[in-house]
Amino acid sequence: MHSRQQTIFALSSGRPPAALAIVRVSGPEAAIVLERIAGRLPPPRQAMRALLHDASAQPIDDAIVLWFPAPRSATGEDVAEFHIHGGRAVLSAVIAAIGTNENLRAAEPGEFTRRAFENGKLDLTEAEGLDDLIHADTERQRRQALRQLQGLLGDRARDWRGEIIAASALVEAAIDFADEGDVPDELIAPAKAKIEILLDEIEDVLAQEGRSEKLRDGLVVAITGPPNVGKSTLMNQLARREVAIVSPHAGTTRDIIEVHLDLDGYPVTVIDTAGIREAIDPVEQEGVRRARSRAAEADLRLWLVDAQAAGDGEDALRAWMAQGQNGFWVVRNKVDVAGEPTGELSATGWPCFSISAANGRGVAELIAALGKFAAAHLGGESALITRARHRDLLRQTADALGRAIDLPEQVELIAEELRIAAHRLGQLLGRVDVEDILDVIFREFCVGK
């Protein structure tokens, strides 16, 4: 592992070519590097125009440079930034000039953010929010990530931890009295009252049913059904481009095709699967096996049938339902040819839609319904928990608080449960016992962040 005392540098903006590029340097040598390349240091936190030079005094670029002395910087260390023209040659020359300085090395993925975390500029939940913000594809993902970055969960966790410590102080005082054979109720009762309020608040957060976690990853919708009913044509309609091969021959789709949709800010991944039938071809058999597996994991399955022969898919649909599969919508396709659909599939009780994937009839209504489904199953504006790590630690915190409440007057055991609860919230914030997960979390970041 690299030393945190080393100075690091990296491109912190998009890849060239671009109008501008930002190269960031962080660490004890940042001022030396900036002065060598720009000629002098600008006033702290003020932009300065400078002609950059390499080690042989050859000019590189007319740029803007900034200087952020520690601790008032993004990482908490000395930080220099070079705002340069975003051509490949310019960037390469600036990176080369920086790299010729001693005690410098290229930054690892997420290393700037990790240094900010280690220097107390943000807690672990806020760092995770920053990672989510970088990877947000939709507006609602962006909003949720920004709330996390701004400390929505971290602030609540710090408040809870402070209340637990206050309750612990009362219990510890009661322990002192217990040594004398008397446990005063006026100490234990208010402590347990605090704990009960905290437990109710945490249980309310845990009751959010993982919707915010789901918003990070998005819903998965599988298009399933018998072969040659128009699944690939529907996939192309949803994607508004040709992503799947359309053929009159059954069994054309043999692998799984994915399309990512943004439905009113909600992320939805639609997968087109091989037609469900008893296949003879080994390749098609494997496609059917994969289709069944992925569809079983999906949040919603669109069972597509030919409106001219809707009953042909009924037995297969009921077979899936008998296996405990849920979340089905029946979609009757080819109504442009068949007219009003026939069959008894609506008797299954699942929502039914009539469309023509060929000319787009009814597809807008299907997409609108998918958007409503996503809104009903993904997080709201007040959601706090966005990762399984958050949920696990809050559940452990709540369990410890619950045990503390259930203990009668065993003050030493109550104190221990409160210590466990405070420790779990410390882990949530990244302040205790998290070294083993830091590498995993910050490795998800891009280089330069």
Swiss-Prot record:
Q: Among its keywords, does the record have Magnesium? A: yes
Establish whether keyword Hydrolase is in the entry: yes
* Keyword annotations: Cytoplasm, GTP-binding, Hydrolase, Magnesium, Metal-binding, Nucleotide-binding, Potassium, tRNA processing
Limits of the TrmE-type G domain: 218-375
* Cofactor info, note text: Binds 1 potassium ion per subunit.
**What's an example of a GO molecular-function annotation for this chain?**
GTP binding
Q: Where in the cell is it found?
A: Cytoplasm
Spell out the HAMAP family in the cross-references. GTPase_MnmE
The entry assigns this protein to a family as follows: Belongs to the TRAFAC class TrmE-Era-EngA-EngB-Septin-like GTPase superfamily. TrmE GTPase family.
Give a short account of what the protein does: Exhibits a very high intrinsic GTPase hydrolysis rate. Involved in the addition of a carboxymethylaminomethyl (cmnm) group at the wobble position (U34) of certain tRNAs, forming tRNA-cmnm(5)s(2)U34.
Q: What is this protein called?
A: tRNA modification GTPase MnmE
What species is this protein from?
Answer: Rhodopseudomonas palustris (strain BisB18)
